[in-house]
Amino acid sequence: MKQVQTKRDWKKLAYDVVEEKMITKEDAIAILEADDTEVLEIMNAAYIIRHHHFGKKVKLNMIINTKSGLCPEDCGYCSQSIISEAPIDKYAWLTQEKIVEGAHEAIRRKAGTYCIVASGRRPTNKEVNHVIGAVKEIRETTDLKICCCLGFLNEDQAGQLAEAGVHRYNHNLNTHANNYDSICSTHTYDDRVDTVQKAKQAGISPCSGAIFGMGETIEQRAEIAFELQRLDADSIPCNFLVAVKGTPLEGQKELTPVECLKVLAMMRFVNPTKEIRISGGRELNLRSVQPLGLFAANSIFVGDYLTTAGQEPTADWGMIEDLGFEIEECAL
């Protein structure tokens, strides 16, 4: 006879988390492996945790791609890598004026965090100073939180960014340590962890997440969440692979909308007090169930991503309003 799996009490598990009882890896795997018919119960349970810590607030973030393509790394998922044949715009650094203009566009889009992103392995000291010049002007003229994502950092560069007023530094783990060699050969998983730690040591809030759907196992997905817990990442972007044509992963099967929802819920259970952001691949992977994602997550990007299009800001604002949620005001 086929063994009947005992149905979990997801709501009880959520209240345990609210009472600061951490879930186990087995609990996290159970969320990911739950029958699709349970997904609404799981999202409702995740919302108990999300609402306890964040109420109905949704944080909006906006990206500016200040340097596109021209990257020497061989990350298999990335359209900007040296091995990518994807037809993307390639350009060197935007001027400081353009970066500052982007900050004011972020405000028009009701974003509270402005993310300055550049392709490449690591920035030169001259490039860091270029970013710092723009950051200082943005800090003088707006109340935006500023996040930077410039590649690997050394201690001096991290300290300079912190002194300039950079609030957050993004450096994703991308995938599980044991899966890393299958997506990149030009740097290691430990290299990425090192930069997250350097940013934190400099006093910058660490932002680190993953791209789900790159061949990792269910168990590895759960372990990624616990690794981010260990690193104490304050903000966790959950990206879902967009299999871009011209990249080595172009044929990779993308996750279903329900699989994406389970990832978001699992991440909320494991990291209950952290900002969970639905990031790249939100529109293409979650599709018509995007609104449900915000029952676990409390943050999204508004507008376009690095090389892929997002939906119009008005659509995001409308989605948030329709849910009865509120956009978190831009404030430090």
Swiss-Prot record:
SMART domains: BATS, Elp3
UniProt cross-references to InterPro entries, sorted A to Z: Aldolase_TIM, BATS_dom, Biotin_synth/BioAB, Biotin_synthase, Elp3/MiaA/NifB-like_rSAM, rSAM
Cofactor remark from the record: Binds 1 [4Fe-4S] cluster. The cluster is coordinated with 3 cysteines and an exchangeable S-adenosyl-L-methionine.
Function: Catalyzes the conversion of dethiobiotin (DTB) to biotin by the insertion of a sulfur atom into dethiobiotin via a radical-based mechanism.
GO molecular function annotations of the record: 2 iron, 2 sulfur cluster binding; 4 iron, 4 sulfur cluster binding; biotin synthase activity; iron ion binding
Organism: Bacillus mycoides (strain KBAB4) (Bacillus weihenstephanensis)
Gene responsible for this protein: bioB
Protein name stated in the entry: Biotin synthase
Pathway the protein takes part in: Cofactor biosynthesis; biotin biosynthesis; biotin from 7,8-diaminononanoate: step 2/2
Entry annotated with the keyword Transcription: no
Complex and partners: Homodimer.
PANTHER family: BIOTIN SYNTHASE, BIOTIN SYNTHASE, MITOCHONDRIAL
Taxonomy of the source species: Bacteria, Bacillati, Bacillota, Bacilli, Bacillales
